[in-house]
Amino acid sequence: MSDEAKQAIEHFLHGQVECWNNGDKEGFFEHYRSMTRSGLSIEFVGRPLPTDSWEILEGMWAQQQPRCRIEVRETIINGEEAACYHYNAMRDGNGGIETIELYRFDGGRLWVRYFIKN
C-alpha cells in the first residue's frame, strides 16, 4: 500500500471521529463519501443485515451523535484494513459503550463492521 493510501485511511478514521465529536454532520458524511466511490456496506455484527448503509449512518447521527462522544482508545491500520477500539462516552456523564470497528477499503468501496459490547 502506498503512503498516500495509508494517509487517506488515517485522515478518514480520525476525521470522521473529529466531525462526530464536534457535531459537524456535513464533514462526517463527506469523510464517508470520500472513501466510498464504489459503495458502502455497514454491518452491526449479531444483528440483521441492513438494507441501506447511508440510512444507517443517518440514523446513527440522529440517534447517537447528540448522546455520545467518541474516545479513541486504539487504531491499527494494516494494509487496506483498520481496526478501531472506541469508547462511546455518554455526554451526560452516565457511562458509555465500547465498540470495536473493522474497516476494509478496496477499490473505492468501504466495508464497516461494528462490534458493540452490551
Model-predicted regions and their roles:
Residues 16, 28-32, 40, 57, ...:
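Hydrophobic pocket/interface hotspot
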Residues 6, 25-79:
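A solvent-exposed, acidic/Ser-Thr-rich amphipathic alpha-helical stretch
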Residues 44, 86-87, 114:
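Residue-level recognition of conserved beta-strand positions in structured domain cores
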